[in-house]
Amino acid sequence: MSDVTQQKKRKRSKGEVNPSKPTVDEEITDPSSNEDEQLEVSDEEDALESEEEFEGENPADKRRRLAKQYLENLKSEANDILTDNRNAEEKDLNNLKERTIDEYNNFDAGDLDKDIIASRLKEDVAEQQGRVFRYFGDKLLISEAKQSFTRVGENNLTCISCFQPVLNKYTFEESSNGDKNKGRLFAYTVSKDLQLTKYDITDFSKRPKKLKYAKGGAKYIPTSKHEYENTTEGHYDEILTVAASPDGKYVVTGGRDRKLIVWSTESLSPVKVIPTKDRRGEVLSLAFRKNSDQLYASCADFKIRTYSINQFSQLEILYGHHDIVEDISALAMERCVTVGARDRTAMLWKIPDETRLTFRGGDEPQKLLRRWMKENAKEGEDGEVKYPDESEAPLFFCEGSIDVVSMVDDFHFITGSDNGNICLWSLAKKKPIFTERIAHGILPEPSFNDISGETDEELRKRQLQGKKLLQPFWITSLYAIPYSNVFISGSWSGSLKVWKISDNLRSFELLGELSGAKGVVTKIQVVESGKHGKEKFRILASIAKEHRLGRWIANVSGARNGIYSAVIDQTGF
């Protein structure tokens, strides 16, 4: 383990002599470190005082106290919104030459206060029920997004995971004056060359700042052939996935060496190694349950494993897929959604009930073509039905595998496939309720020289087979902002696409594109900062030259290894 800013030790010269009298070692510290220590001591003292103050209260008093505190927080938020509105109005009035008061400017502050509190209560109830309650898709200023790209030294980033406090109401300016980790946001990346790296992403106006890294290698190859003894404290094969715990204490990695490693986020030192104990148990994806220590792992041996990270133990194994479980997603409820690659199914696992729901995909081009022909058929004057020519039909591609998944809320999720499909699913229906085909476009046509060596142009065109050799861009990454109507998709088409789900959760449409993501998008994450209703969103994506699970994608134009960042603001109304 090594810090980026590690200093070399000064060698002692021959002329230096140890002092005869015993002396006390002195530590050279800067004022900021003393302030941090004082802040930590004061925080501990405040925590002890609060524990002593409420030591004798019964459960009913505790519930009453928490309810009062909750209402006070709502009132303070409402007051903040009111003061902001009044300041904005006063500023507008000062800019006017003639100040006139009309019916629009006359409002009751008390009624507005009640409306704000009522709307917040509705949002909290919707969040507890696990339903979408954040509708800010129309407010995003995507065209004004501030984009940046950070080059990294690792080869082919495979995943990125971000840590954000549960109630993050801090800005960068506020957090820089207090505790060094209070309200801070961190990102963790892993790569095919066995490196785990930690970044500070708190300041949205700056690029991610590299803090620490941990490197694996051949020295961690176990000497024993038994899978249950695969407990060396480091990775010796490609790291494919990473997940940061919601409490910020741990970060978990997994990969082709068939084990999970739990790392301390402070020092990036290994805390616990948990082997999958299966020769095919490569860990492909990880997801933490929201505000919990429960971890879900999807593996290449067709199984889903659940863990309790605070106890460093495996809880149970879930069976059902018929191919590798390529991706997994989870939110607040004790359930997760997985996709099984070439078995073309998505499964929702209700873990407490020990049941699952199976959702089947699999587009068939011939059926889709026949359906399109029937929908566009016209009846002639003689009553005969005339079908359009097949050359006029749009391109339909066979769905070979479902590769990525992300939960929108506890009752809806989205999936991405290798034929460019993005599908919206509901638990009430076994088939997708809406499908966007060829979401990221079609790959460029192969040239004549790549297909045929014939000199005759007619023969070469015949061997090119018209449109049959065209292929779509795969959907390599999806991320839905939890409980909202916005999600982001990625491929290797050179841009990320931002989509908005309709208010009735029955369809979605394209909001805009974020250009500059040159390479294969292997993972997307979103963090946010700011007051309620005025959040600023930062989209982070790990970009690589290869697909995270193989080397099928080659020669991507302008591809680079790095972290893509885009900061998006909201309109104030």
Curated annotation (Swiss-Prot):
Keyword Nucleus: yes
One cellular component (GO) term of this entry: box C/D methylation guide snoRNP complex
WD repeat copies, ranges: 234-273, 278-317, 320-359, 397-435, 471-509, 516-562
Main location: nucleus
Keyword field: Acetylation, Coiled coil, Nucleus, Phosphoprotein, Repeat, Ribonucleoprotein, Ribosome biogenesis, rRNA processing, WD repeat
Example GO biological process: endonucleolytic cleavage to generate mature 5'-end of SSU-rRNA from (SSU-rRNA, 5.8S rRNA, LSU-rRNA)
Coiled coil: 32-106
List of residues that carry N-acetylserine: 2
Origin superkingdom: Eukaryota
GO molecular function: snoRNA binding; U3 snoRNA binding
Gene3D superfamilies documented for this protein: YVTN repeat-like/Quinoprotein amine dehydrogenase
Anything else known: Present with 5130 molecules/cell in log phase SD medium.
This protein's domain notes: The WD domains are required for nucleolar localization and U3 small nucleolar RNAs binding.
Assembly and interaction partners: Interacts with UTP25. Component of the ribosomal small subunit (SSU) processome composed of at least 40 protein subunits and snoRNA U3.
Similarity field: Belongs to the WD repeat RRP9 family.
Protein name, as recorded: Ribosomal RNA-processing protein 9
Natural source organism: Saccharomyces cerevisiae (strain ATCC 204508 / S288c)
Higher taxonomy: Eukaryota, Fungi, Dikarya, Ascomycota, Saccharomycotina
Record gene name: RRP9
